[in-house]
Each structure stands twice: as C-alpha cells, then as structure tokens.
C-alpha cells in the first residue's frame, strides 16, 4: 500500500478504506456510466468522475486526486474521439480509414486503463493515465 504525506503535519498516512472505495468508485463509475451510455459519447464517463470529485474533494485528497485523474482521462478520450469524427467529416468520409483504427485503439486503451486505475485505487496506489490532458487541476 502506498503511503501519502500530509502537507500540514508532514506525517505519512495510508488512505482509509473509505478513501480507497471512493477513489476506485470514481474510475469504476466513469467506466460503468460510459459503457451504459455508449463509450463513443465519452463524456458520460466524465460526469461520474466529476460527481465523485465534487463529493470528496474537501474530504479526501487521495480520492479527490483519483476522481480528478478519471475526469481528465475521460474528457481527454472524448476530445481524441471528437477529433477523429472531425477528420471523417472534413475529409468527406475518407478519414474513416484513419479514424476507425484510432477509435478501436482509444476504446481498448480506455477500457484497460480504467480497469487498471480502479484496481490500483482500491489497493491504495496512485495511477496516472497515459495520454491525458490535465484540464482540471
């Protein structure tokens, strides 16, 4: 289990069971909501992470950091998928040759990384998603 240092006291602590559950819930909630509403819409996953972040941001630095990371990742995946859609539109459909593999890779990366993040959070470790634009700090 990863220890965290509290800035105010300088003491090392481990995240509580509740902190770990909220953190894992941010990732799992984003994953579940996005899957239930079609991952292509993408932004629904960010809503779940945002709700968790709003609930825990003043209560648990560990859970808030995980929720913020899940929020940033889901928004980033939405942006990347939207860029691929624009490519298809602006090339009058020819861009599908590039966009389709991009969507497949994004979907697999999103699924695998979200699962890894959920398990890491529940184990009390931090996880940084790859290719994430950190819009929310």
Question: Where are the predicted features?
Answer:
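Hydrophobic alpha-helical transmembrane segments in multi-pass membrane proteins
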Residues: 23-47, 72-114
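Low-complexity, intrinsically disordered extramembrane tails and loops of integral membrane proteins
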Residues: 1-21, 132-137
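Hydrophobic aliphatic residues
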Residues: 32, 54-55
């Amino acid at each position: 289990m990863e220890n965290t240092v509290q800035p105010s006291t300088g003491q090392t602590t481990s995240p509580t069971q509740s902190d770990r559950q909220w953190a894992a819930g941010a990732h799992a909630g984003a994953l579940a909501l996005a899957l239930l509403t079609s991952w292509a819409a993408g932004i629904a996953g960010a809503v779940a992470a945002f709700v968790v972040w709003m609930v825990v941001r003043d209560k648990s630095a560990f859970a808030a950091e995980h929720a913020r990371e899940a929020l940033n990742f889901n928004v980033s995946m939405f942006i990347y998928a939207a860029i691929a859609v624009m490519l298809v539109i602006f090339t009058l459909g020819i861009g599908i040759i590039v966009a389709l593999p991009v969507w497949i890779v994004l979907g697999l990366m999103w699924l695998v990384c979200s699962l890894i993040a959920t398990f890491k959070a529940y184990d009390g470790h931090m996880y940084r998603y790859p290719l994430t634009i950190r819009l929310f700090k």
